[in-house]
Amino acid sequence: MGERRRANASRGDKKVANGEKQHVGQWGRAWEVDYFSLASVIFLLAFAPLIVYYFVMSCDQYQCALTAPVLDLYSGKARLSDIWDKTPALTWTAVKIYLAWVSFQVFLYMFLPDILHKFVPGYEGGVQEGARTPAGLINKYQVNGLQAWTITHLLWFANAYHFHWFSPTIVIDNWIPLLWCANLLGYSVATFALVKANFFPTNANDCKFTGNFFYDYMMGIEFNPRIGKWFDFKLFFNGRPGIVAWTLINLSYAAKQQELYGQVTNSMILVNVLQAIYVVDFFWNESWYLKTIDICHDHFGWYLGWGDCVWLPYLYTLQGLYLVYNPVELSTTAAVAVLLLGLIGYYIFRMTNHQKDLFRRTNGNCKIWGKKPKSIECFYVSADGKRHYSKLMISGFWGVARHLNYTGDLMGSLAYCLACGFDHLLPYFYFIYMTILLVHRCIRDEHRCSSKYGKDWKLYTSAVPYRLLPGLF
């Protein structure tokens, strides 16, 4: 194991003919850890689970008033033990529900190869290739997320309106006990990934060791950990069980609103519709997702494993949870405005990504906004010493800003929050978090590209100077 670490650590740089130092295989997470990164990692490991618990507890015990628990503790009206005593414990019912859920998603992922791509025009499913890894490999993936999502939701509606095997409110009725189950899976997966990377990695050349336990545990060591040929940890845990569950969780919230108040408010419908568009878009473009930063940059550790099991399903669905406890009926004008903001944001997000995908598929032999797109050609060297070429487009939305897809994503995120009105801060956490996440991702992605492409990246940033907001940032 020590020899593998030394071998990996020596792969950083290589001399080329002109004597300059050329970065080799330098994308992916860091080889070394600075103090700020280490402090951030330790902070997240210590407090991220508490943040999730605090948000969910605030709704369960304080009607989603974020400051109320702190004020009660400060004033002496409540003690930590009082809050904890009111928190639902882990139950066997929740364990059985969660085990059934995860097992069902594993079954759909592993044992039902995609057939939708055979008769749904425009959909790219089945066996697809990912991007080249730092070690120079191109992995193949079984893309069947849209099929899994469709089957899951057809069964959910069949149960809700015909079979009645379980209540449509089953998720929210067991929401906090399910939180403990999700944490158990998240930590188990992250720990297994750490052990696997050290003792039986899928590809040792795509492992990165820093020598710091906390950083390696959180950010991951293996680039693409797998069990067997097809069970890819990244693809499974990012899409299933988290994102497939996203829309089911929202449907459970809507069912609870109907049960409690006798109606589903237009704000709940808006949240369900706008977030469902995002989820379906994700699975429709799952093969495109194989070329994004999560697959092409991140190693698999606690950040992805626990985050996909806990952070995503619990904090990305806060708007629906808030509306269960605080139903909001928007005016027609406000509802239309929120809908338009969400749809325009989605259009920018989707068309920006579509332009990039079209440009890649055709190697630039296409038209963007009626013209042949302009680009800057770059080269990089993978860890196996091979030289590869890429083109960075500077036309269409990609000529307006380097990450305008993130701008559209943020517009959609804001729409989800605005549907909840302005009485509480809690539903706006998602927009605040996504802003921080995507700005950080901009910087992280550009650091990766700068390491990967060198001086060619500087030419690109000169041609497209803004990241998210033209004229501002």
UniProtKB/Swiss-Prot annotation:
GO BP, sorted A to Z: brassinosteroid biosynthetic process; cholesterol biosynthetic process
Places the protein is found: Endoplasmic reticulum membrane
InterPro entries to which the protein is assigned, alphabetical: ERG24_DHCR-like (IPR001171), Sterol_reductase_CS (IPR018083)
Region described as Disordered: spans on this chain: 1-20
Protein keywords: Cholesterol biosynthesis, Cholesterol metabolism, Endoplasmic reticulum, Lipid biosynthesis, Lipid metabolism, Membrane, NADP, Oxidoreductase, Steroid biosynthesis, Steroid metabolism, Sterol biosynthesis, Sterol metabolism, Transmembrane, Transmembrane helix
Alphabetized Gene3D superfamilies for the sequence: 1.20.120.1630
Signal peptide start-end: none
Catalysis performed (reactions): cholesterol + NADP(+) = 7-dehydrocholesterol + NADPH + H(+); 7-dehydrodesmosterol + NADPH + H(+) = desmosterol + NADP(+)
Sample GO molecular function, one term: 7-dehydrocholesterol reductase activity
Protein name: 7-dehydrocholesterol reductase
